[in-house]
């Protein structure tokens, strides 16, 4: 992801969105392939076959990758920060951790990704228990979520190049809350509100995934973005742990998912507030 963005500094949002969308589609493409392999052999053999295939593909593709030259600038493009006399400083991970804005961005990532990680983990179960879908029909919910997740990464990345990263994340936070409220209002047979809800959550989650690589590079420089974004990814890991855990515990306690949607709404609103906290630090820096 970071290598691609270095070659396209004028389109960091779009390129970050496309690359994250492509690796996100792996969760859609791989399962049916693995299912066929397991059916033909067994689980242990499937792990070996997939592992060897990945090793060959990844190592093979690595021969075609090139390191981006230092201070690379596409023809005809002038870096806006340099033109404004406000050049972004390339910070390493230690310097990044010393800045207050890093922790704001980390918490924003967790809050923004919370609803997506929560619903992705239980999308099929929600469709079955809340809407009354059959297991076969409920499986389409996962596919719909994956499609809007991938679309959100590309569309939000492109949008962030036009209106700015933080403005795009503000919109994504609101969209996620709207999606959660639609799920909260969903009952038996509520196909329309259910699919609209997971579509909104998919777009919101995809937006955070697509925008954050460029967002991190914009804030701390592109030179060390591979490491810096890897550390920033801890925010997603937090959402990946607390989101599904909260949903399972609430369902086990209450026998319904509605309380989990309200908890996720609180995180989404907190994320929206954090976008203004980020703006405060950004203005202070300027």
Predicted regions and their residues:
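Interfacial helix-cap and linker-helix signal at transmembrane-aqueous boundaries
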Residues: 32-41, 46, 127-128, 159-160, ...
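Extracytoplasmic gate region of multi-pass secondary transporters
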Residues: 94-156, 244-247
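Helix-loop-helix hairpin linking two adjacent transmembrane segments in secondary transporters
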Residues: 23-70
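Cytoplasmic helix-loop-helix junction between adjacent transmembrane helices
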Residues: 1-21
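A late C-terminal transmembrane helix in Major Facilitator Superfamily
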Residues: 27, 219-254
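C-terminal ends and interior cores of transmembrane alpha-helices
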Residues: 175-188
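Flexible cytoplasmic inter-helical loops of multi-pass small-molecule transporters
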Residues: 67-90, 286
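Cytoplasmic membrane-interface "Motif A"-like loop-to-helix N-cap segments
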Residues: 162-173
């Amino acid at each position: 992801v970071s290598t691609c963005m270095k070659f396209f500094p004028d389109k960091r949002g779009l390129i970050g969105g496309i690359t994250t969308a492509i690796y996100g589609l792996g969760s859609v493409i791989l399962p049916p392939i693995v299912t066929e392999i397991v059916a033909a052999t067994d689980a242990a053999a499937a792990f070996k076959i997939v592992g060897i295939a990945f090793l060959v593909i990844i190592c093979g593709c690595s021969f075609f990758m090139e390191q981006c030259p230092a201070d690379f600038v596409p023809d005809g493009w002038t870096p806006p920060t340099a033109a404004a006399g406000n050049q972004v400083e390339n910070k390493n991970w230690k310097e990044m951790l010393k800045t207050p804005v890093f922790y704001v961005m980390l918490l924003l990532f967790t809050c923004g990704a919370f609803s997506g990680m929560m619903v992705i983990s239980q999308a099929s179960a929600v469709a079955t228990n809340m809407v009354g879908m059959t297991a076969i029909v409920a499986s389409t919910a996962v596919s719909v979520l994956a499609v809007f997740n991938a679309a959100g990464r590309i569309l939000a990345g492109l949008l962030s190049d036009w209106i700015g990263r933080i403005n795009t994340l503000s919109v994504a936070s609101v969209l996620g809350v709207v999606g959660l409220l639609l799920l909260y209002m969903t009952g038996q047979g509520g196909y329309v509100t259910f699919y609209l809800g997971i579509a909104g959550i998919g777009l919101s989650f995809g937006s955070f995934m697509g925008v954050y690589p460029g967002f991190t590079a914009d804030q701390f420089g592109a030179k060390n973005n591979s490491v810096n974004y890897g550390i920033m990814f801890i925010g997603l890991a937090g959402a990946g742990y607390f989101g599904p855990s909260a949903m399972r515990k609430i369902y086990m306690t209450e026998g319904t998912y509605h309380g989990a949607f309200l908890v996720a709404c609180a995180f989404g609103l907190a994320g929206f507030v954090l976008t203004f906290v980020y703006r405060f630090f950004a203005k202070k820096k300027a």
